Amino acid sequence: MHFLLHRPDAERDAGILMNGQVVLCRGINDGVELDRTIRDLSSYRPAMRSVSIVPVGLTKYRDGLAPLTPFDRESAGLVIDQIEDWQKRLAADGVDPVSPHFVHASDEWYILAGRELPEEERYDGYLQLENGVGMVRLLENEVRAALESPSFLKEADEAVDSTGRKVILACGKLIENHLKKLTGWIMERWPYVEICVRAIRNDFFGERITVSGLITGGDLIRQLRDAAGCADELLIPVSMLRSGEKVFLDDLTTEDVQRELKIPVRITWTGGEEFLRACLGMEASAESERQVYESWE
């Protein structure tokens, strides 16, 4: 472990703030090894602000590689219990009042274990969003806030086409049920809007890969060809595309998907209100347009 920690030593001594990630492999670096890792990394607080724990992603391309066992519902629950125990201990010692919980389980653990996501306060300001920690909680809270905003509701009621709208919302299997809950809120408020959540099976990387960010254009085309013709728009999260490009990981573009499915594609999911705007067919806010398109035009 001393070899692995020489970089944090140098960065801490240089006054650099750090956020870390641990990719957990079942039977290899979990259990007592995870305890040791968290203990070692927590000694770098407050320079080390947070550490995310994420499960290893197992694609179908594993010929010649060491065998790895995927986590299941029970083992994911054990990982959560272990991390939450560390959160309580670290928050109690008062070393870093800004990010007291320090170590965070990615959303995937909670969904795999069938558990409720932590409350917002435990994410310490969402320091690990890019590693999939708190994305679902943040999206849900932002959608709820927009649905409780009189100004947004007034704008939406004036903008939404009361003659009817049908959209397909494509996502990975991991977040399917959470998106169905959110879109259920939307359709209850605007019953003339129909939102069909379609979880895309990952044939490109393998069915064990369930995150939205690794869905390819080819998988979208093959699995939505039957339904796209009767929808007004296809919504996809910006995470499906390469950073700063309208290109999927299989080199197909959003234009390719539009052409094959004969349906407009809208890129969204930069926040709860923007998610609502996309579902309802409203114009994106200027800030959302900047975030999604700033390096595309």
Residue ranges, per PLM feature:
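Conserved C-terminal portion of the radical SAM core fold
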Residues: 5-64, 74-108
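Short, conserved loop/turn and helix-capping segments at secondary-structure boundaries
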Residues: 70-77, 251
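Charged helix-capping and loop-helix junction motifs
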Residues: 2, 35-36, 249-253
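Short, flexible/disordered intra-domain loops and linkers
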Residues: 64-71, 244-247
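Well-ordered, non-transmembrane segments within structured domains
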Residues: 1-21, 185-201
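Short, hinge-like loop/turn segments at secondary-structure boundaries
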Residues: 37-38, 69-71, 283-286
